[in-house]
Amino acid sequence: MSHDDLMLALALADRADELTRVRFGALDLRIDTKPDLTPVTDADRAVESDVRQTLGRDRPGDGVLGEEFGGSTTFTGRQWIVDPIDGTKNFVRGVPVWASLIALLEDGVPSVGVVSAPALQRRWWAARGRGAFASVDGARPHRLSVSSVAELHSASLSFSSLSGWARPGLRERFIGLTDTVWRVRAYGDFLSYCLVAEGAVDIAAEPQVSVWDLAALDIVVREAGGRLTSLDGVAGPHGGSAVATNGLLHDEVLTRLNAG
């Protein structure tokens, strides 16, 4: 990973913002249904195609894995991970909580991540060993740091929906966790994890996620001083589920979600 990789990721996000802004709320937005019954729009495809074209020119030796057009899942060497619009359901309904997620993995470990949410006028990014940062409406970036909350009864928790927690026993444990913490909100998708990195939320959890949902978020959370694992406690974005915390609460959250 070099400084140029971060600059490239930020430039890719700039272009993604241009493409998504003009399609958000467009009356002629094309919406299709994928085999997994989730929506995909012409904006999703346009962003991922543009990212792939740029990487093919500027990083021809790097791999690319994206939500819409796939790619290798061996996770060796240098590989860019792209979720062109995280929060497509929000996008199609006119809800401004959506973002383009772009990450660089080196041998499966995120080294650069950018989360860009133009409808919120916010962006978060991080590079390995260089910290995590955010900017609001293009203002001067500020460095991110997770909270120092050390007790669950004082903690704020965010998630996306209850439907994924339906596995027998898991929903009960999750609801038990929500009953224990101080505050629960469903900020959802990328925003839960970015708020953990900002120190505004202490816990984010999702039972079903893909690597493109997490790769950029993983390094943003970690570089802000937090911790991100699967529900099984495996570090990184590959576990198919996610728990992100300020680090101080992590082990207790995992214990509660895996009890029984």
From Swiss-Prot:
Effect of gene knockout: Strains lacking this gene appear to be not viable, even in the presence of high levels of exogenous inositol.
EC code: 3.1.3.15
Binding site for Mg(2+) 2: 83, 86, 213
Example GO molecular function: phosphoric ester hydrolase activity
Record: residues binding substrate: 67, 85-88, 185, 213
InterPro entries named among the record's database cross-references: His_9_proposed, Inositol_monoP_metal-BS, Inositol_monophosphatase-like
Protein function: Catalyzes the dephosphorylation of histidinol-phosphate to histidinol, the direct precursor of histidine.
The protein's name: Histidinol-phosphatase
Lineage: Bacteria, Bacillati, Actinomycetota, Actinomycetes, Mycobacteriales
